Regions:
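Extracytoplasmic cell-surface/polysaccharide-interacting catalytic and binding patches
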Residues: 1-74, 88-181, 187-203
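Segments that shape or occlude catalytic/ligand-binding pockets
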Residues: 79
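Short, well-ordered surface patches within globular domains
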Residues: 82-83
Length: 203
């Protein structure tokens, strides 16, 4: 794994693959398979997180591993200009954070969007991700409906509710907190603190 850029290192960002070696990286914004319908990151984008999240993510992965499960990362550090473009597409702060004068959450590298997967042989095509089968969570990533909220029950199967609870428990073991509005979004320590906007490329 190549080292991160000087800018990333100066900002305290690390590549999640150095923290969770068996993680599956599927950065949706590096493809057109996202709610904007356009590619927002370069194709070789990396999953960067602030070093303060490293221990927690490793702990979460350790909870999943005995079950034959791995963390799947859909988004990590997100540049400010990408956040602006996303809000232009969906200008609703209930679903997309309004860009501001400071970096928080993804823009600070202190939040991640994740699910988990396993090497399950019988897997519906919609949940197939390479050699892995994504857990049934009731919705896809960036689903702008009430079913996507972390503790939703209406329209969410018992299996999906249990899988969400399992993911939350694993992440909580690492001190990471779910955002109630999105089952896939987890915040690390200090995610809500005002910080200078980073000018760090994701590749």
């Amino acid at each position: 794994m190549p080292p991160v850029s000087e800018a990333a290192r100066a900002a305290g960002l690390v590549d999640v693959r150095g923290v969770v070696p068996d993680a599956a990286i599927d950065l949706r914004y590096a493809t057109a398979n996202n709610f904007t319908g356009t590619q927002l990151y370069p194709p070789r984008a990396r999953c960067l997180v602030h070093e303060s999240m490293a221990e927690g993510l490793a702990a979460a992965a350790a909870v999943l591993r005995p079950h034959g499960q791995v963390l799947v990362f859909w988004d990590c550090y997100r540049p400010h200009d990408v956040q602006v473009r996303m809000f232009d597409v969906v200008p609703n702060p209930a679903w997309v954070a309004r860009p501001g004068k400071y970096a928080h959450s993804h823009e600070a590298g202190r939040s991640v969007d994740v699910t988990f997967a396993s090497a399950q042989r019988q897997c519906p095509s919609v949940r197939r991700s390479g050699e892995l089968c994504l857990a049934d969570m009731g919705t896809d990533f960036d689903d702008f409906s009430s079913r996507a909220t972390a503790f939703a029950t209406q329209g969410v199967s018992a299996e999906a509710q249990a899988n969400r609870a399992h993911l939350r428990a694993a992440m909580q073991a690492g001190g990471l907190t779910v955002y109630s509005g999105e089952w896939w979004h987890f915040d690390g320590p200090g995610a809500g603190v005002d910080r200078p906007i980073l000018e760090v490329p994701v590749d």
